[in-house]
Amino acid sequence: MSEEKSFDSYLTDDNLIFIENEYIRIGANISLGGALTYLAEKGKKNLINSSDWGRQVQMSFYAPPAPYQPEGVEMAECWKFIGWNPIQSGDCYRNRSRVLEYRCEDNEIYVKCIPMHWPLNNCPGECTFEVWYRLDGYCVNVTSKINMDRPDKTQYPARHQEQPAVYTNGEWYKGVAYTGKKPFTNDSLTELVTKENGLGWPWLNFAPTENWSALVDDNNYGLGVYIGSTNLSKIGFAVTDKKGWGGPKDDQTGYIAPLGCEILDHNISYSYDYSLIVGQVDFIRQTAYELDKNADRRHFSFERDRDHFYYKDITDKGYPTGGCLDFDFGIGSELKSPPVFFGKGECKQIELDATFEGEISGDVIFHLYEGLDEKNNLKLSDYGVPFSIKGTGERATCSVDISAAPDCFIGFSLRFNNSGHISIYSVNIE
């Protein structure tokens, strides 16, 4: 599908399917895999940047190996570090993803596509993408899904996944979020990227402890992104001397990407949900507060999948899980939680519904949250507390005391100090 057409020739209305409500209008681009290339409040400017195939609001997934280059396929040298990376719009050579199916109803757009590997020339991903966009007031509620069909059946380690990748036009340059230790209390916000601080590129890694962040203009109006499953994110602005102006076809752009850490099995169907919120930053924040009332970051079930848990130096039985995480562990290997925020003194124990025999010993490694460094990047430090649990070979609930955690933390690991086998059906943080 390689063509010499310019990027912006695919941004015309005849390539988009639109839905709107009383407040906002969105356009999914069916020439670019259904990526979102138009989002605006009624009567206002389009917020979304589309200067190349790697922008838009779109899905992008990552897995080893890196580099990833099938035999006979050209790879862009500057992108070889990325590895396996299908994205929704198309590749860096201007080959577009192929839409398989789409439909547009009063309040929902659905698109299914075969994505393209970003670093490779005309190499479709060994998967399909599906996306559902639904309008609710000033929100776009989105479900994004990947269906893997990868011939390489290796269970590779987890990698960070953009959930999703969001690119705004240059007018919406200011990166704002709450990054403190008292989330959902209307505590003071942090301006991460401004005209004055010179930050934005490279992208900043940070922890939005209220599960939202936003890119806004000089009047604090713009686009927010909420996701309930992670407190890790990137934010930034490219072409830092052009903050505050620019349209969909200009190089300068704001960027937000909440980050999950996921294992992508060769056959997995994996989805995530997020919301795009249009408005003033205070409105974005209060909307995120309402959305977060339905979030659960304390109870994890492994009935069908890993529920955002992953490993260091462990391979389990794959996807679907068949009811539990079933794996052998060795000295130094780790079971790792998703990067979610836990307040100081908020949690007393980890409850494991599990089957194992004998004693398991190790350390709970808390990733203590220390806020931001001088460049507004995330600061974490590890703090370990020993644990020991005993099993009879029968399924039972056992508890690991975590009351000794000295401060807030963002996720934890169970690091094993011996070898054995365990089946874990659920993890509850109480």
Regions from the PLM with identified roles:
Residues 2-24, 31, 205-297:
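Beta-strand-rich recognition/accessory modules
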Residues 7, 70-137, 151-155:
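Extended, loop-rich substrate-binding clefts of extracytoplasmic carbohydrate-active enzymes
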Residues 31, 40, 127, 136-183:
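Acidic (Asp/Glu-rich), glycine- and aromatic
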Residues 289-316:
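Extracellular carbohydrate-recognition regions
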Residues 322-347, 395-398:
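Short beta-strands within extracellular/lumenal beta-sheet-rich domains
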Residues 342-351, 406-409:
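Extended extracellular/luminal ectodomain segments enriched in beta-structured repeat modules
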Residues 375-407, 418:
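Extracellular carbohydrate recognition and processing domains
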Residues 412-420:
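Short beta-strand-plus-loop segments that form exposed binding edges in beta-rich domains
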